[in-house]
Every structure is written in C-alpha cells, then in structure tokens.
C-alpha cells in the first residue's frame, strides 16, 4: 500500500473523528441550553398551564435561540402552553422583510409580523449623534404590549441572557446610582403584562455558538448596532475583560444577584438599621468588626454542571 493512500486514509479518518466530536459538542450544547432555560422557567414559575406566550423575535441570535429552545421544551413539558412568535418590523432602511416570515413559516409555530414605522419617528426626534436606544425601546415596548393584548397573550418572552442581566446591573450602579438589575420575571410598567426572560441563566457565548450550529438568518440592527460608543457596549467590554483575567468572575457575580444580604448594605428601606437591638444569640451574619474578609476561589457552578454532564 502506497504512502499516499495511507495518508489519505489517515486524513479521512481524522475528518470523520473531528465531525463526530463536533456533533457530540453540539448535542451537549443543545442539552445545556434546554436545561438552563427549563431551570429558569421552573425557578421563577415563568410559564404555567394554559399560558399563551408571545415570543418576541427581532432577527438577532438571542431571540432566534429563545424561540428554538422554547419550541423544543414545549414538546416535552409536563404542562400545556401555546407559543406565538411576534416580530416588529420598524421599517428600518434595508431591513430584509422577507427573512423572518420565510423562516417562521417553516416552523411549527403561529407568528405575527407587526408593521410600524418607528424608525422615522426616532430619526426625526433624536438629534444626530445622540443615542437612539431609549426612544426606540419605549416605542417598541408600547407596541409589543398592545399586540400582546390583541393576541390574548398571557406572557411576553424576551431574549435577554445572563450577560445582559449583568450588564444592566452595572449600568444601573455606574450611571443611575442604583443596585438594580434586569428581572427574570416582572409585571410590565403598564401593569397589564407579565414579562419573562427564559434565558436568564444562559451565557451569551452559548447563544453565539448555537446560532452558528443552527445557522439562523441573522438580521443586523441598523439603529442600535451602528452606535459603537454605547454605555452598554462599554460595560460589556469591561465584563469580558474581567472574565478573561479572572475566569469564573462573571459566574460569581451572577450568583451574587441571587444572594443578597440587605443588612450588609445601606438601604434603610430594605433593613431597619434604626431599631436594631442585641439578641444575645450568635449570628454568623453578624458584624465581625476588624476581621478581614476571606474569599474562596470562584466556584464556577455553571461550568461544574457542564463538566459533569459531559462525562
């Protein structure tokens, strides 16, 4: 047997092995996404029996992934609920209006395209060079709330993920002087809708990879995506740099959002500092005066789950 023939066999075998490895990794990613979305739904009671969930699909990777995973979970869920995909066509120049209807039409899910020219309003009202996101978001929110009522939706699902929630927390702290984040579930500001974020536990890197696996027809935003100096982007870059230098830090920060100790902050509306009294009973959470705080290495709970699942 010639060396050339043997080399070709080795290369062919390597390609097959590599293909199988990629397939296994993709399958693990799918299981992880379904598990994390399912866990968030259960932890926060996001979807209940008989719900009609309006899934907001923008054409970005996050909303595509949310719809994709919710459709998978719908088939195996212990309760019955309906999904309807909704896209708001804001009449942005160059927006490929056929992409979403074509994509959604191939799925086993009802969908609605809402046509509203918010682009012209935003460009007319906001001075050149100013951030467009605030007004665009308000207009979009009001329209989606109205559409939810017209469609009889009981929940509105948005595609925000773990990184979005962390960014929002730091944005509020840096620029609004508030310890306030992005909730996984909350009544909308009009008091008429319940907004849920099923991907609250999902890191953005998993969604980026899943978009590649599924080959979603991504539609870039010509408004938000074209503004490079947005505060959110700056905070996002900061968090990514932290994670690069200190692996596991984002996981710990996200866990901190679920582990709040009001007595160790300074908000007198959350803790009655004025009327505290001694009890004579030892308390591990009591003040330790001059003792230096001791911190363990980041546990990275999300990654430990992944490692266990991959064995």
From Swiss-Prot:
Molecular function terms, GO-annotated: 4 iron, 4 sulfur cluster binding; ATP binding; magnesium ion binding; sulfurtransferase activity; tRNA binding
Keywords: 4Fe-4S, ATP-binding, Cytoplasm, Iron, Iron-sulfur, Magnesium, Metal-binding, Nucleotide-binding, RNA-binding, Transferase, tRNA processing, tRNA-binding
Compartments, record wording: Cytoplasm
Binding-site positions, [4Fe-4S] cluster: 133, 136, 224
Motif (PP-loop motif): 58-63
Catalytic reaction list: cytidine(32) in tRNA + S-sulfanyl-L-cysteinyl-[cysteine desulfurase] + AH2 + ATP = 2-thiocytidine(32) in tRNA + L-cysteinyl-[cysteine desulfurase] + A + AMP + diphosphate + H(+)
Pathway of action: tRNA modification
Main EC class the enzyme belongs to: transferase
GO CC, one annotated term: cytoplasm
Cofactor(s) required for function per UniProt: Mg(2+); [4Fe-4S] cluster
Keyword flag Iron-sulfur: yes
InterPro entries (alphabetical): Rossmann-like_a/b/a_fold, TilS/TtcA_N, tRNA_Cyd_32_2_STrfase, tRNA_thiolation_TtcA_Ctu1
Signal peptide range: none
Biological processes annotated in GO: tRNA thio-modification
SUPFAM superfamilies registered for this protein in UniProt: Adenine nucleotide alpha hydrolases-like (SSF52402)
Subunit structure: Homodimer.
Family: Belongs to the TtcA family.
Other information: The thiolation reaction likely consists of two steps: a first activation step by ATP to form an adenylated intermediate of the target base of tRNA, and a second nucleophilic substitution step of the sulfur (S) atom supplied by the hydrosulfide attached to the Fe-S cluster.
Protein name, entry field: tRNA-cytidine(32) 2-sulfurtransferase
Organism: Polaromonas sp. (strain JS666 / ATCC BAA-500)
């Amino acid at each position: 047997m010639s060396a050339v023939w043997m080399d070709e066999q080795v290369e062919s075998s390597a390609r097959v092995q590599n293909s199988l490895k990629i397939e296994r990794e993709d399958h693990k990613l799918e299981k992880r996404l379904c598990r994390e979305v399912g866990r968030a739904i259960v932890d926060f009671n996001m979807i209940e029996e008989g719900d009609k969930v309006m899934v907001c699909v923008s054409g970005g990777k996050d909303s595509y992934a949310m719809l994709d995973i919710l459709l998978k979970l719908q088939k195996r869920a212990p309760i019955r609920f309906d999904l309807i995909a909704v896209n708001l066509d804001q009449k942005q120049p160059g927006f490929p209006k056929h992409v979403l209807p074509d994509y959604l039409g191939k799925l086993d899910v009802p969908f609605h395209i809402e046509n509203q020219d918010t682009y012209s309003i935003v460009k007319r009202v906001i001075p050149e060079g100013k951030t467009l996101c605030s007004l665009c978001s308000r207009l979009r929110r009001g329209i989606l709330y109205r559409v939810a009522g017209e469609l009889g939706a009981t929940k509105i699902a948005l595609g925000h993920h773990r990184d979005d929630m962390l960014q929002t927390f730091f944005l509020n702290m840096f620029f609004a002087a508030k310890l306030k984040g992005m909730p996984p579930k909350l009544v909308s500001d009009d008091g008429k809708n319940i907004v849920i974020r099923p991907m609250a536990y999902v890191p953005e890197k998993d969604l980026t990879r899943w978009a590649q696996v599924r080959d979603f027809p991504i539609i870039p935003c010509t408004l938000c995506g074209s503004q490079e100096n947005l505060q959110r982007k700056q905070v996002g870059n900061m968090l990514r740099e932290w994670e690069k230098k200190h692996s596991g830090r984002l996981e710990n920060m996200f866990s901190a959002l679920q582990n709040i100790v009001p007595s160790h902050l300074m908000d007198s509306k959350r803790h009655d500092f004025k009327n505290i009294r001694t009890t004579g009973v030892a308390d591990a959470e009591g003040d330790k005066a001059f003792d230096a705080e001791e911190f363990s290495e980041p546990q990275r709970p999300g990654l430990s789950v992944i490692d266990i699942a991959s064995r």
